[in-house]
Swiss-Prot record:
GO cellular component: plasma membrane
Membrane topology label: Multi-pass membrane protein
Keyword Ion transport: yes
Organism, as annotated: Zygosaccharomyces rouxii
Name listed for the protein in its UniProt record: Na(+)/H(+) antiporter 1
Length: 791
């Protein structure tokens, strides 16, 4: 007789198994992901196999009841939550700006993959007709948003360019819902053979118009109403922080419920609801520092893949009665990995603006994971076929026996889908592809941070302190490049500039603003000069004001005369990028461009004519001033350069959201051209700023790794290790202090009251409750920081 306190149920064992796995894996998750390059989905599936009915039989969902029905609803909830989260985390108005790239991946690429998989299933599996093969292909065509998180978020994502992360994230969130037309067209072809009119009527009227189009409209309505409701509640201060963070989860469940009740595509409902909910970027800004969604996603992923690993039909993988053999499934898996997406993406690469190189096209084509979406599509398809055979509630807990109508299609559907998922989890669940891509990309992170130079607190003696301090007194000086007489090396540009630093509050930025209307070509230079500090970035940065041996070495820049070699700053590639970028921007005179051979274009200009919400040509009485201030604060971070990376002969500069700010390509003959994405409605070419070209040269792995900087009198000199002068700047202080007059400028663009656009994420989030004076404080000088990700 067992002690009655030890009456263990199946649910208790399931809780314990999930808890033990989640606890152990969480403790070693960083090691497994970064050292072993294995994702949590693979480890969870293996654990589910071990504790499942095929091994230890501790965790057996097959004994819980109708397994297909349980799996269908779990998959539905997980997908709706993940799809909604993906659409919320996209940059604001992403679908409007990148609709062509997303459409090319959703329509021609998915159609190609669907037909290719169907063809090989029809060839490899004996007894299946072509409509049944089309159904198999439709279930495993879409990419999975859950498995895609391994490349679009987390540590691995830092090795992938932001525009690729956004593209993969958007595609994975949208194409699960767009798999419905392929699935139901295959079902109609299977159920109504030879009845073309019935097929067309059912597919167009029911699937396309009702399930997809009406479902998308329903999602937009839910998202729009949710956005207005939460903004009203937050404005009235009647919602607490916890409910505010959980609101998007509530909306995702609402989409799943209404979508299922109305018989529409609930995944499309969730995606478009999330897109409409986060359309203006307000919610994403408010919850930027919160990790609630990530925590929930991790817990759901752990539990789901343990569950999935325990219910995989291992016996059916080698079941000759239904026409399946292991070798057939292995060949089919190779076809799925290599022919499902890669050929179509490579072929359409010139038509996809967000794919900038063949390597990126190869990566986008390769990374098409199959996971939860395929499970959902397979069980839903099986349920639809079973509903035409029986009056019982579907999906059934068993597969109809041999001899019943469409029995082989229903019997093969689940094993083929599961084997494809296993292959995808092994191939895409690891991050080797991401690591290999990052190995070829030379990335430089650009951030800005305020530093203070006071006699009482600053003990550092950096050579950059040889520049006059940018104090609040507004003491002016000019910085002039003197290396104009040196012959440019191949791939180098010759720029002769001079400039003047004025008062921080209404100095250089005001002068730039005034010249903006007379010289439109300098707009990108102005935007690139505002490098925004990102406080949540936890990676190390290099401070040019730091004179330790780890950064710039020892120096005595104040010593007049020729600097001794021991007093010279020895800089690596990263520090040289930082120095050249910062000093060239200081020395840049917008009225004296003498740039040859380089031409770039602004790929996306925030607030351009097609973005009518963010243009400032409006009546001041029509829009509240707080709303205009909020819009301005949203636009500013999007115009700040965050990361630059080079690949082959091109350099790409992105903001923190992954939107491409500048994209330049250099050819061997010295002539460079620029390419713009399709979302830019006109190519406005301009002369490239020197830092853009310098980033391409210095981040090149073939360039020299050591540079020397020293001061001779009023000259700052930068040399490479061979002794060739790389840059020379002359500092010309101007006596006296300038008196600054504040005057009102009739400019439709609200005037910034500070030279530095430094503000925290919390200030951006609460922009409607704070005035402009609170958002921008007095600025000290601006120090550039650079983090090199190339190594």
């Amino acid at each position: 007789m067992v002690w009655r306190q030890l009456e263990v149920t199946k649910a208790h064992v399931a809780y314990s198994c999930l808890g033990i796995f989640s606890s152990i894996f969480s403790l070693v998750s960083l090691f497994v992901k970064e050292r072993l390059y294995i994702g949590e989905s693979m480890v969870a599936s293996v654990f589910g196999l071990i504790v499942g009915p095929h091994c230890l039989n501790w965790f057996n969902p097959l004994s819980w009841g109708n397994t297909d029905s349980i799996t269908l609803e779990i998959s539905r909830i997980l997908l709706c939550l993940q799809v909604f989260a993906v659409s919320v985390e996209l940059p604001r108005k992403y679908m409007q700006k990148h609709w062509l790239s997303v459409t090319m991946l959703l329509v021609p690429v998915m159609t190609s993959g669907w037909l290719v998989i169907a063809l090989f299933v029809w060839i490899l599996v004996p007894g299946l007709n072509f409509p049944a093969s089309l159904l198999m292909g439709a279930c495993i065509t879409a990419t999975d948003p859950v498995l895609a998180q391994s490349v679009v978020s987390g540590t691995f994502a830092q090795k992938v360019p932001g525009h690729l992360r956004n593209l993969l994230s958007c595609e994975s969130g949208c194409n699960d819902g767009l798999a419905f037309p392929f699935v139901f067209l295959s079902i109609d072809l299977l159920l109504y053979p030879g009845r073309g009119g019935e097929i067309v009527k059912d597919w167009i009227c029911v699937t396309i118009l009702w399930e997809c189009i009406f479902g998308s409209i329903l999602g937009c309505i839910i998202g729009y109403c949710g956005r207005k409701a939460i903004r009203f509640a937050e404005g009235k201060r009647i919602i607490d922080r916890e409910s505010f963070l959980a609101f998007y989860l509530i909306l995702a469940l609402t989409c799943a419920g209404f979508g299922s009740m109305l018989g529409v595509d609930d995944l499309l409902v969730s995606f478009f609801a999330g897109t409409a909910f986060a359309w203006d970027g307000w919610f994403a800004t408010k919850t930027h520092e919160s990790n609630v969604s990530n925590v929930i996603d991790v817990l759901l992923n752990y539990a789901y893949f343990v569950y999935l690993g325990s219910i995989l039909p291992w016996k059916d993988f080698n079941n000759a009665d239904i026409g399946l053999d292991v070798w057939r499934l292995i060949i089919l898996s190779l076809v799925v990995i290599f022919l499902r997406r890669i050929p179509a993406v490579l072929l359409l690469k010139p038509l996809i603006p967000d794919i900038k190189s063949w390597r990126e096209a190869m990566f986008i084509g390769h990374f098409g994971p199959i996971g939860v979406g395929a499970v959902y599509a397979a069980i839903m398809s099986k349920s639809q076929l079973e509903s035409h055979l029986t009056d019982e509630e579907t999906p059934l807990n068993y597969t109809p026996g041999k001899g019943s109508k469409h029995w082989q299609a229903m019997a093969c559907l689940w094993p083929i889908t599961c084997f494809s998922i296993i292959t995808s989890v092994i191939v895409h669940g690891s991050s080797v592809a991401v690591i290999m891509l990052g190995r070829y990309l030379n990335t430089v992170t650009l951030t800005a941070a305020p530093t203070s130079r006071t006699a009482s607190t600053s003990t550092k003696n950096s050579w950059l302190q040889s520049l006059p301090p940018f104090d609040k007194s507004g003491r002016p000086f000019s910085l002039q490049r003197l290396d104009k007489e040196t012959s440019p090396t191949p791939g180098q540009i010759d720029v002769r500039t001079s400039g003047m630093i004025a008062a921080p509050a209404l100095g250089m930025r005001q002068r730039w603003r005034q010249k903006l209307h007379g010289n439109k070509e300098t707009e990108s230079d102005i935007e690139m000069s505002d490098l925004q500090r990102q406080r949540e970035e936890h990676t190390g940065t290099i401070d040019l004001n730091d004179t330790t041996t780890e950064t710039l070495g020892t120096t005595n820049a104040r010593t007049p005369g020729l600097a001794q070699r021991s007093k010279v700053n020895i800089m690596n590639r990263t520090e040289t990028v930082n120095t050249i970028y910062g000093l060239d921007k200081l020395a840049d005179d917008t009225e004296n461009h003498d740039v040859y051979h380089v031409e770039t274009s602004r790929v996306h200009d925030i607030g351009s004519s097609h973005d009518d919400v963010y243009t400032y040509e409006f009546d001041a009485d029509s829009i509240d001033s707080l709303e205009r201030e909020r819009i301005k604060l949203l636009r500013e971070p999007e115009q700040q350069a965050y990361i630059a990376y080079t690949e082959d002969n091109q350099v790409i500069i992105e903001n923190r959201q992954g939107e491409i700010l500048e994209y330049a390509r250099s050819h061997n003959d010295g002539v460079r051209d620029a390419e713009a994405g399709s979302h830019n409605q006109g190519r406005h070419k301009r002369a490239s700023s020197p830092p853009l070209e310098r980033l391409r040269q210095i981040t090149n792995e073939a360039c020299k790794t050591k540079y020397y900087a020293y001061k001779v009198g009023n000259d700052l000199i930068v040399e490479d290790e061979s002794g060739e002068e790389f840059r020379r700047y002359r500092i010309s202080p101007h006596g006296g202090k300038r008196k600054i007059k504040k005057k009102k400028i009739n400019n439709p663009v609200p005037e910034r009251k500070n030279h530095s656009l430094l503000h925290s994420e919390d200030e951006m989030a609460d922009d409607e409750a704070e005035s402009e004076e609170e958002n921008y404080g007095d600025s000290d000088d601006l120090a550039l920081f650079v983090k090199d990700h190339a190594d």
